[in-house]
Amino acid sequence: MESIGIVAPQTMHFAEPLRLQSGSVLGNYQLVVETYGELNAARSNAVLVCHALNASHHVAGVYADDPRSTGWWDNMVGPGKPLDTNRFFVIGVNNLGSCFGSTGPMSIDPSTGKPYGAKFPVVTVEDWVHAQARVADAFGIERFAAVMGGSLGGMQALAWSLMYPERVAHCIDIASTPKLSAQNIAFNEVARSAILSDPDFHGGDYYAHGVKPKRGLRVARMIGHITYLSDDDMAEKFGRALRRADGALDAYNFSFDVEFEVESYLRYQGDKFADYFDANTYLLITRALDYFDPAKAFDGNLTAALAHTQAKYLIASFSTDWRFAPARSREIVKALLDNKRTVSYAEIDAPHGHDAFLLDDARYHNLLRAYYERIANEVGA
């Protein structure tokens, strides 16, 4: 199926200060946005796609100056794809605190003329949703046909349905959770500790030193990447295969250099990530993950937290996802059903772990295609 083709981002500037959940106020900020498809006359066919930890506004298509720059969900969004841009107007927003053009730690603090660095305020999922709502306002979109996301993006979709219930017709929440478990918070803490203990971190102000805490960021990514894959998937891809420069397949080096294929893979992923991602952004986004817990204000009662939602829901999980296991999605489903909301739920049998939500799986895509067909019929798209 064809890609949407060449796309270009746009930068939106906001002068009205944004009060964050922490109490900090962010003024004169910018958000980078990409759109695909055409907004209909009734402005009823808009879909917001929320991104996960290391992704961005670049959901689909490619950039003219880099044909390898395929959007992170290009298999899902485009002409004739499950989220069909011939029928829907799709928006991707790069969240505050990111390192892909929206205001974040790498941006210049107007009060100092230097990068914010560690002084950039902690942001939350709720802060992102408020900022995204201003993007919707700028496009004149009063109500989204759907807000959709996977993983951390799914948390944003759920938050949209809570915070702006009248502005969301459908919430599509994939491979997500209503809150992080202690184990997930622990993984994030180990990853942050790797960054914070890197000598090149310099308290978060490494920009002034002309360095990046690549060693810490590399380890953080390696830790995270392990949690995105299933044990079966890793066994299938790597097993205990050895990686030897001399071509020998059955002998150990008896050293601490790379011996196994899985070690080589993790180091490659870590090095690649450390080259393009920002360490301060990693700290911010993992903390936003930790803080997300809409039931907290309701004494841990998720049913009470979701009582005022109005959207219809599609909740999807993957059988081998142990980062955000199917049981976490079922918690959301139960709370919605307790509130007599309209909910569709699917647990997809897939071997790829948490990352399955990014992959081109026929059953998964058919599910989304059918659901968007239903939405298209509702809005006349």
From Swiss-Prot:
Pathway: Amino-acid biosynthesis; L-methionine biosynthesis via de novo pathway; O-succinyl-L-homoserine from L-homoserine: step 1/1. It catalyses: L-homoserine + succinyl-CoA = O-succinyl-L-homoserine + CoA. GO terms for molecular function: homoserine O-acetyltransferase activity; homoserine O-succinyltransferase activity. Residues 45-360 form the AB hydrolase-1 domain. The keyword Transcription does not apply. The active site is at residues 151, 321, 354. The record marks 323 as: Important for acyl-CoA specificity. Substrate binds at residues 221, 355. Its EC number is 2.3.1.46. InterPro entries: AB_hydrolase_1, AB_hydrolase_fold, HAT_MetX-like. SUPFAM superfamilies: alpha/beta-Hydrolases. Its main location: cytoplasm. It is found in: Cytoplasm. Pfam families: Abhydrolase_1 (PF00561). GO terms for biological process: homoserine metabolic process; methionine biosynthetic process. One of its GO terms (cellular component) is cytoplasm. Keywords: Acyltransferase, Amino-acid biosynthesis, Cytoplasm, Methionine biosynthesis, Transferase. Belongs to the AB hydrolase superfamily. MetX family. Homodimer. NCBIfam families: homoserO_Ac_trn (TIGR01392), PRK00175.1 (NF001209). Transfers a succinyl group from succinyl-CoA to L-homoserine, forming succinyl-L-homoserine. This is Homoserine O-succinyltransferase. It comes from Burkholderia cenocepacia (strain HI2424). The lineage of its organism: Bacteria, Pseudomonadati, Pseudomonadota, Betaproteobacteria, Burkholderiales. The gene is metXS.
